[in-house]
A protein has these predicted regions:
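C-terminal amphipathic helix plus adjacent low-complexity
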Residues: 376-436
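Conserved nucleotide-sugar phosphate-binding/catalytic loop shared by glycosyltransferases and other
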Residues: 38-82, 155-156, 161-163
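Donor-nucleotide binding loops and adjacent catalytic segments primarily
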Residues: 3, 216-324
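Conserved nucleotide-sugar donor-interacting segment of glycosyltransferase catalytic cores
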Residues: 92-161, 216-217
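Conserved nucleotide-sugar donor-binding subdomain of glycosyltransferases
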Residues: 69-120, 161-205
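N-terminal subdomain of nucleotide-sugar transferases
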Residues: 2-55
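A donor-sugar binding/catalytic signature common to diverse glycosyltransferases
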Residues: 110-113, 311-359
Length: 436
């Protein structure tokens, strides 16, 4: 790719949705391009602090600590949360999102879109801007060959015995019950063809789909879009944002590897008794503990000897020091847990978390305990199994070694540059009807 290209990366969500795009943007910037991260206003300071260009795209959802706790509870509810998030917050803002993104892509060479930001494909198709779509987790593909495991239907992991034909039919029924009426009406107003449900097949670019996870985690399936390329996990850890606190360094040096308990950046706001039960579970198995509590509101009333609580620590620094990591199963934390090379206990809350837990379980590195069952005796039993059976630690190291041979941001940047080169050589190949 000869001259620097302006590349808009549009994303939406929690840190697990922001960090991979920041990692790719930093790699593109290192190669001389001009990447722009287009997302919610609350991330401006974070993104600009990393030396990246930022553009605000609505909806402007406030920081979790400033939100009504009831709203976060609704979003994180296992069965109804995804529908509430999409139909209550994302879809109604699609016109605002479109207007903001339309300004951002003026003069851009490429648009990169996110599965939960439906304005992105509309902007790409309407303007003729070449665009690449992404998925962060295998759940987004809704594959009949690797059936998704939603948090409220754990039995679906056994569906594969029915064969892809039957599973595909059942998944089709499920997808047809999820409408994106507001988005499809706006798409029709823009004069764009029906390219499928914006939540499912309509999110995928016909040019290229980047899977931002490793083939170690989920192998490509026959019903993934044929234009899919697997880039690998794209790690960003923000060392420049948060130093490892000296008290944590001292804690780690003076004893055996602890159990690390974390709920990422979203589930931590609906932690309830998670950290209290975690302290008791660690006591029962005779292990020290590090609690990443996210906010003072989760600080336990008292911390026993051998337990330290901190708001947040970069995972790349902390997780490899653990004997076990207990987390919620967000794809960002799941990937960091696998990269760290230690066994994990995954406690899914909502969204794709139970499916990520199932993929980790199949790797032999992890066990799963659902949120409703998270009580100290059960947690202690799971921790005992992970610590007692050497296969978990052995497999965790094997998987980690494989992931360390990959470079997701570099591979993603290579695949983006391929499309940019193709655009330069034959622009008509990537031009989409504007509908004008």
């Amino acid at each position: 790719v000869h001259k620097p290209k302006r590349i808009i990366l549009n994303t939406f969500g929690s840190f697990g949705d922001i960090h991979p795009y920041m990692a790719i943007a930093m790699e593109l910037q290192r190669r001389g391009h001009v990447p722009v991260v287009a997302t919610m206003e609350i991330y401006r300071e974070k993104i600009e602090g990393a030396g990246l260009e930022f553009v605000a795209v609505r909806p402007n959802i406030p920081q979790p600590k400033e939100q009504d706790p009831e709203l976060i509870e609704k979003i994180m509810e296992p069965k109804t949360g995804p529908r509430f998030l999409t139909e209550g917050l994302i879809f109604p803002a699609v016109r605002d999102s479109y207007a903001d993104l339309l300004k951002a892509v003026a003069g851009a060479d490429l648009l990169v879109t996110h599965p939960a930001a439906p304005a992105g494909p509309l902007v790409g198709r309407k303007t003729g801007t070449p665009w690449i779509s992404t998925v962060l987790a295998p759940f987004s593909f809704i594959s009949a060959y690797d059936p998704p495991v939603p948090p409220y239907w754990q039995w679906t992991r056994r569906l594969s015995v029915l064969g892809p034909g039957v599973v595909g039919f059942l998944l089709g029924m499920m997808k047809s019950s999820h409408k994106a009426k507001v988005v499809t009406e706006f798409r029709d107003e823009l004069g764009l063809d029906d390219n499928g449900n914006p939540m499912f097949e309509g999110q995928h670019s016909p040019t290229r789909v980047l899977a931002l996870f490793s083939e170690v985690f989920a192998k490509p399936q026959p019903d993934w879009p044929p234009q899919t390329e697997v880039a690998g996990f794209c790690f960003y850890d923000g060392h420049h944002e948060t130093e490892v606190p000296p008290e944590l360094s001292r804690f780690l040096e003076k004893g055996a590897p602890p159990v690390v308990f974390t709920l990422g950046s979203s589930a931590v706001w609906v932690a309830r008794d998670f950290f209290r039960e975690s302290i008791e579970a660690a006591r029962r198995v005779g292990r020290r503990a590090v609690l990443l509590i996210g906010d003072e509101r989760n600080m336990p009333s008292s911390l026993p000897e051998g337990v330290i609580a901190l708001d947040y620590v970069p995972y790349l620094s902390l997780l490899p020091e653990a004997c076990v990591v207990v987390h919620h199963g967000g794809v960002g934390t799941t990937s960091q847990g696998l990269f760290a090379g230690v066994p994990t206990l995954i406690v899914p809350f909502a969204f794709d978390q139970s499916d990520n837990a199932e993929h980790a379980r199949k790797l032999g590195t992890s066990r799963t305990l659902y949120r409703k069952d998270y009580f100290a005796p059960r947690v202690a039993n799971e921790l005992t199994e992970l610590l007692r059976q050497p296969s978990y630690a052995r497999r965790a190291i094997e998987v980690s070694q494989k992931l360390k041979r990959e470079d997701g941001p570099a591979r993603a940047a290579d695949l983006i540059e391929q499309i940019l080169t193709r655009t330069r050589n034959s622009p008509e190949e990537l031009a989409y009807a504007s509908g004008d």
